[in-house]
């Protein structure tokens, strides 16, 4: 993303927005991390990746019990930090569809609410807006009841992106990784 918007007096970049998404999905308990977080998931495993999903978060907690069990849910995110970038997205609906079909929920994530005008949000999409160091849901996404199974290429690129994202996050700074490291006894020991 080349364009940036101002958030307060600072320019907001895609990296800033991805950090906010990582904060939103930083959660864990005794069973481990709640979300597998992945930045920049490609549609193919090779070099010819024309389509990239900005961010995916797979909820690893099953949700519900018995017949109401929902199973893990995949959230896909398209990040926009400028109005012109959003308008480009609207002109090419196939870009989002390359990934949306695999997701239970699809979100547009913007640095400012003014990037999206009333009536522009495609049917079924949710909207998240930057607030502080995280994002807040402004419009809930509809659940996609016709989720398609991921191709082997997308499975591979998702796994690679989860690994890269987890390695990039600092376990001292990321609350989910910090808790998980403590539970797994992976905390750094200091000499006395």
For the regions a protein language model found, what residue spans apply to each?
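Short amphipathic alpha-helical segment that frequently serves as the phosphate-/nucleotide-binding helix
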Residues: 15, 52-54, 90-93
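Residues at the C-termini of beta-strands that transition into short coil/loop
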Residues: 41, 59, 80, 131, ...
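Active-site metal-binding core of divalent-cation-utilizing nuclease and nuclease-like domains
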Residues: 7-9, 24-75
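Short low-complexity stretches enriched in small and charged residues
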Residues: 55-66, 80-86, 171-173
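Non-catalytic C-terminal interaction segments of nucleic acid-processing enzymes
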Residues: 1-35, 45-46, 118-192
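Catalytic cores of nucleic-acid endonucleases
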Residues: 71-123
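Acidic-residue sensor for enzyme active/binding pockets
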Residues: 14, 39, 78
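Short, solvent-exposed loop/turn segments at secondary-structure junctions
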Residues: 42-44, 62, 82, 113-115, ...
């Amino acid at each position: 993303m080349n364009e940036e918007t101002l958030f307060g007096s600072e320019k907001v970049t895609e990296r800033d927005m991805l950090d906010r998404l990582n904060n939103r999905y930083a959660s864990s308990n005794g069973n481990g991390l709640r979300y597998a977080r992945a930045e920049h998931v490609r549609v193919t495993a090779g070099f010819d990746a024309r389509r990239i999903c900005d961010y995916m978060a797979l909820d690893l907690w099953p949700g519900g019990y018995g017949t109401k069990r929902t199973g893990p849910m995949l959230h896909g995110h398209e990040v926009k930090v400028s109005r012109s970038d959003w308008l480009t997205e609207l002109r090419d609906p196939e870009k989002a569809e390359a990934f949306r079909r695999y997701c239970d929920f699809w979100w547009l994530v913007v640095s400012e609410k003014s990037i999206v005008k009333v009536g522009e949000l495609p049917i079924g999409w949710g909207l998240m807006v930057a607030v502080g160091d995280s994002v807040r849901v402004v419009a809930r996404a509809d659940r996609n009841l016709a989720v398609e199974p991921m191709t082997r290429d997308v499975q591979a690129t998702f796994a690679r992106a989860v690994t890269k994202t987890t390695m990039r996050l600092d376990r001292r700074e990321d609350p989910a990784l910090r808790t998980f490291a403590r539970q797994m006894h992976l905390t750094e020991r200091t000499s006395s």
